[in-house]
Structures are given as structure tokens and as C-alpha cells.
């Protein structure tokens, strides 16, 4: 494992712990500047790795990238996904009702307003927004191949409830959130018809339950992320545990399932027409 990867995981686990950088540095007996250097990929001693693992309540092997990484906070999970995406050449995913990396600025705007009504921790909100902005910008610059499968059931709920489905918001904001949801689904239909190079969507029509997962293939390895956290949920939510791993047995099993689902899913003109039918049935008028 490269030192930069240890640094990336250190940052993700620091966010997962909820501890401040200066608090962790003080407990380790190092400066905050030294901690940030570790996160940037500078050499870190094994005894420091051991103390960090104990402090962050993770296995030293996990901190070194061997085993399974678990995250119970959306903030830390999406930070880890951001790190892996930055080195991925191909992304395969069973996703939310949208593929966040190709959503519009309006999606971010309405979500930020909804979160601001519920979360008082401004720093948490800013960190969350920075991570998602960085994810989209990285995709825009690198353009990895992306294949996304969307569940029809989740799209129906998305159109009925709008962006931020699980976030409590005013009736006025909920109406706006539904309008943005309809716009996003309309954009996906247009993207399907336009067939841009390296970007594909399909619909899962008859699948009652799927686990959101992302396979990210880089030059050296493939990483799997299993995710209960939707990209339009509050950063303060603690309703699940996500995981990230490069274990071959987990990666291969999920890859086989994704390949079967992709082969059986609705694609192309048929998928675009189905999305427009869902818009006509469920979108706000």
C-alpha cells in the first residue's frame, strides 16, 4: 500500500471518529501539522500507526488498507469514496435515484437549503459540501467511465418526495425539492438518449430490493463500497454502517451480481421512455 493511501484512510477515519485534528494530535503527542503531513502521505512510523488505530478504534491492519473499512457517518464514508474515485478509471454502481457525479448545481443548492434547516453544525455542513463538490469536480476533470443502474422504485419515491427525501423540510421547500427531482430525472433521460462516451444508465424494473454499491476500478486494484447512505441525506444522519474493501471475494461476488443486473436491465430508448412515463405519473405538476 502506498503512503498516500494510508494518509487518505487516516483522514477518513479521523472524520469518522468525530474528533478534531488538534485533539488527535495532542493524544498522539505530535503536532497538528505532523498529523496533516501524515494525511498527505508522509512517512509514518508503525508505532504511530498502532497508537492511531487504538485512538480511532480501528484495526491497525484496516488503517494500513488490509481488511474491511467500516463507516457509520455519511461524512467519512463519502470522503473515502472521493479518495477512491480520484484514482478510478471505471465506476460501476447500483445507485440512488440519480448518479451524483452528473447532477446539476440545482441539486446541491436545494439539498444545502434543506440541510441548513435541520443541522446547526455549520462546519459539518461545509465539510459535507466540500466533499461532494470535490467529487463532482474530479469527475469533470478525469471523466472515468461510469455505468449506473437505477431502481424504478427509488425513482418513483424520489419524484414523489423530492431531493432530501428523509430530511424534514417546509412544504414550500418540499415543493421546490420535487421540482428539482423532476429536473434531474429529465436530465438522465436526455443523457440516455444522447449516449455520451463513457456514461451509461439503465433501469432496474422488477428488482424489489438492491443494495446500493459502487465498484471502482483503478490501475492497481478494484475497490467495493457498500452504502446505506444516500447522497441527499443529512450529514448528521447515523442510520447505517457502510463499508469499503478491496477483498477479492467481496469484489468478485458483487461484480458478478452487477453484470447480471446490467444484462437484464432496461437500457437505451426504452429506458428513456420509461423515465418520461414515471415523470408523467409521479412528478409534481
Regions found by a protein language model. Give the residues of each.
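Short, surface-exposed, charged/polar-biased interaction segments
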Residues: 31, 45-46, 56-59, 70-73, ...
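Short, well-ordered helical secondary-structure segments
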Residues: 6, 25, 31-33, 88, ...
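Hydrophobic protein-protein interaction segments
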Residues: 93-284
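Basic, Lys/Arg-rich alpha-helical nucleic-acid-recognition elements, primarily the DNA-binding modules
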Residues: 1-77
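Short, charged recognition helix plus adjacent turn
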Residues: 66-97
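Residues at structural and domain junctions
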Residues: 10, 20-21, 38, 87, ...
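Alpha-helix boundary/interfacial micro-motifs
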Residues: 30, 49-51, 56-59, 74-78, ...
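Alpha-helix boundary/capping detector
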Residues: 40, 50-51, 61-65, 78-79, ...
Amino acid at each position: 500500500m502506498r503512503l498516500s493511501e494510508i494518509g487518505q484512510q487516516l483522514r477518513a477515519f479521523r472524520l469518522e471518529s468525530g474528533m478534531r485534528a488538534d485533539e488527535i494530535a495532542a493524544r498522539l503527542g505530535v503536532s497538528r501539522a505532523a498529523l496533516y503531513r501524515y494525511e498527505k502521505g508522509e512517512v509514518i512510523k508503525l508505532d504511530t500507526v498502532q497508537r492511531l488505530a487504538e485512538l480511532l478504534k480501528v484495526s491497525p491492519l484496516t488503517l494500513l488498507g488490509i481488511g474491511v473499512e467500516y463507516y457509520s457517518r455519511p461524512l467519512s464514508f463519502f470522503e473515502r469514496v472521493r479518495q477512491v474515485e480520484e484514482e478510478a478509471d471505471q465506476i460501476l454502481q447500483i445507485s440512488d435515484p440519480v448518479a451524483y457525479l452528473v447532477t446539476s448545481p440545482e441539486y446541491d443548492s436545494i439539498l444545502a437549503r434543506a440541510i441548513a434547516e435541520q443541522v446547526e453544525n455549520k462546519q459539518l455542513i461545509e465539510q459535507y459540501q466540500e466533499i461532494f463538490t470535490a467529487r463532482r469536480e474530479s469527475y469533470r476533470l478525469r471523466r472515468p467511465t461510469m455505468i449506473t443502474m437505477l431502481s424504478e422504485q427509488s425513482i418513483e419515491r424520489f419524484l414523489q418526495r423530492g431531493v432530501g427525501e428523509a430530511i424534514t423540510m417546509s412544504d414550500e421547500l418540499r415543493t421546490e425539492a420535487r421540482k428539482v427531482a423532476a429536473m434531474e430525472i429529465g436530465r438522465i433521460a436526455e443523457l440516455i438518449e444522447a449516449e455520451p462516451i463513457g456514461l451509461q444508465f439503465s433501469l432496474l424494473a422488477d428488482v424489489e430490493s438492491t443494495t446500493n454499491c459502487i465498484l471502482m476500478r483503478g490501475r492497481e486494484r478494484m475497490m467495493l463500497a457498500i452504502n446505506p447512505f444516500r447522497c441527499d441525506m443529512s450529514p448528521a444522519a447515523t442510520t447505517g454502517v457502510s463499508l469499503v474493501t478491496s477483498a477479492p471475494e467481496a469484489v468478485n461476488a458483487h461484480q458478478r451480481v452487477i453484470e447480471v443486473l446490467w444484462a437484464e436491465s432496461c437500457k437505451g430508448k426504452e429506458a428513456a421512455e420509461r423515465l418520461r412515463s414515471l415523470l408523467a405519473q409521479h412528478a409534481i405538476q
